[in-house]
């Protein structure tokens, strides 16, 4: 209300209050003080590595082929989108071998892999290109070798056997092991005579030559006895085998053997028959 042409206190205070309320509102909306690294990040737009559209789309992104300058190493072909579908198949198809690609100015075309049924993929084998066969050398089967059987006579004359033998002009000769009896030319073994001499201990020392002489004497005596006993066997005409009786008669009739073996008694050898000649039936010639 106006009175006496002067404004009231309320009308004067209203604009002041409005200014104060505006200042209070501004102070309430002021953001707190932030560090410089957060203030910089405010103006940088946030970008995600993967867009929302990539998760929503079911099909994978198509690979982009970049043109490259020809290099000495052969460039490998990139697979197309059909390769992703081939991985989800129940049985993976076997790779096909191809001839090595030569370096060219044009980029290689992507290789397409065709899907096959499980039955065909199991029976299919890796195919090789015709150029790989042409590069290989022509292989012919080896001819069968004929084997000849040789007789024993031809084997001895073969040069392989001659090489294994010792040379003709060899200085060393093969030594044949022989006993002392064979070297002395005796049938009675000298080693056995030596064993008996050393076992009976007739003397303290036994020379190696004494055994040889004793074996020679024994062999001579045995030969004499056998010769005389054969003569007695031929006179008896009753048996064809030398017996004790024949040996005893041969010793008693021989002068040297009877003097040597006078004290020897031969079992079942008998005695000399001492019959008077008048009792004997003499023949007409006697």
From Swiss-Prot:
One of its GO terms (cellular component) is nucleus. It comes from the Eukaryota. SUPFAM superfamilies: Histone-fold (SSF47113). InterPro entries: Histone-fold (IPR009072), Histone_H2A (IPR002119), Histone_H2A_C (IPR032454). Residues 1-180 are annotated as: Disordered. One of its GO terms (molecular function) is structural constituent of chromatin. Residues 1-26 have a biased composition (Polar residues). Residues 44-59, 76-104, 115-138 have a biased composition (Low complexity). Pfam families: Histone_H2A_C (PF16211). Belongs to the histone H2A family. This is Histone H2A.v2. It comes from Dictyostelium discoideum (Social amoeba). The gene is H2Av2.
């Amino acid at each position: 209300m106006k009175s006496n042409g002067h404004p009231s206190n309320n009308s004067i205070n209203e604009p002041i209050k409005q200014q104060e309320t505006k200042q209070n509102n501004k102070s309430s909306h002021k953001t707190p003080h932030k560090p410089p690294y957060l203030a910089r990040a405010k103006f940088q737009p946030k970008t995600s590595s993967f867009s929302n559209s990539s998760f929503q789309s079911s099909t994978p992104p198509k690979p982009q082929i970049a043109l490259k300058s020809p290099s000495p190493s052969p460039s490998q072909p990139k697979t197309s989108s059909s390769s992703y579908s081939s991985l989800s198949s129940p049985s993976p198809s076997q790779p096909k071998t191809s001839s090595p690609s030569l370096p060219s100015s044009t980029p290689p075309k992507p290789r397409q892999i065709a899907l096959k049924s499980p039955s065909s993929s199991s029976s299919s084998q890796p195919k090789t290109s015709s150029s790989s066969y042409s590069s290989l050398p022509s292989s012919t089967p080896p001819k069968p070798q004929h084997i000849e059987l040789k007789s024993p006579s031809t084997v001895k004359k073969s040069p392989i056997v001659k090489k294994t033998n010792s040379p003709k002009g060899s200085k060393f000769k093969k030594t044949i092991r022989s006993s002392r009896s064979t070297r002395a030319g005796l049938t009675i073994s000298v080693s056995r005579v030596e064993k008996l001499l050393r076992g009976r201990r007739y003397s303290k020392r036994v020379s190696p030559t004494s055994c040889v002489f004793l074996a020679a004497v024994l062999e001579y005596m045995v030969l004499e006895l056998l010769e005389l006993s054969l003569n007695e066997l031929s006179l008896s005409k009753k048996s064809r085998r030398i017996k004790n009786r024949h040996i005893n008669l041969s010793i008693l009739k021989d002068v040297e053997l009877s003097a040597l073996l006078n004290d020897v008694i031969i079992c079942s050898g008998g005695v000399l028959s001492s019959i008077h000649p008048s009792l004997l039936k003499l023949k007409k010639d006697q």
